[in-house]
C-alpha cells in the first residue's frame, strides 16, 4: 500500500476503538503512516497504577482510572490548541471510553468521585470524522494479549474481558456522534496482511456518514 499525503486523507480525525487486545494501536499506527498523519496514542505504559490494577483491581482501580482521565484530557487539550483542519490525526481511543472503563471497574462511591472530577474537567473532545470499532471474540483477545507479551497483561481475567466486550457493544449500539465502521477483526491481520489492510482502507475512504458493518473476506494470501 503506497503512502498517501495528508491532503488526500478522507477524514481529518479517525479514531480506532475496541476492547483490550483487539489491535487498535497497531491499526492506528499503520493508518497514520498511510495518510502521513499525526498519531495520538494512549500511553498505557506511563500509568504507574496499571500493573497494580491488574494484580488487584479493587486496590488500584480509582488511581489507574484517574491517571488515564488526566492523560487523555491533556492530549485532547493539545489537539484543541491547534487547528484541527490543518492536521490529519489518527487516535487509538475515544474519550468516552474513560467513563466506560470507570463504570466497569469502580464501585459506587469511587464512581461518584470520578464523575465529579470528570465534570469539573469539562472535557471538550473533538468529534471524530470516523470511528472504527474493532470486534473480536474473547478467545482471540486473550491470544493476542499473550502474543504481544506485555508482562502485566499476561494474567488478564477472562471475566473482565467478557464484561468489557459487553460494555463496548452496548456503547456502540447507541453511538451516533460520528460515522461508525464496525469491523469484524477476528481473523483479519491489518498489520501484516496487505490484502486485509487494503480492503479495510477501501472501506474507510468510502464512508462519509452513517453506520457501516464490515466483515473482511478471509485472505488466501
What are these model-derived regions, one by one?
Residues 16:
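Hydrophobic anchor at the beta1->P-loop junction of P-loop NTPases
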Residues 1-12:
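Extreme N-terminal, non-catalytic leader segments
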Residues 19:
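P-loop (Walker A) phosphate-binding loop of NTP-binding proteins
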Residues 60-126:
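Glycine-rich phosphate-binding loop used to anchor ATP phosphates in small-molecule kinases
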Residues 98-169:
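A glycine- and Lys/Arg-enriched "phosphate-lid" helix/loop adjacent to the NTP-binding pocket
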Residues 24:
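Conserved lysine of the Walker
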Residues 29, 33-71:
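Conserved substrate/cofactor phosphate-moiety recognition/catalytic segment
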Residues 146-154, 162-221:
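NTP-dependent small-molecule kinase module
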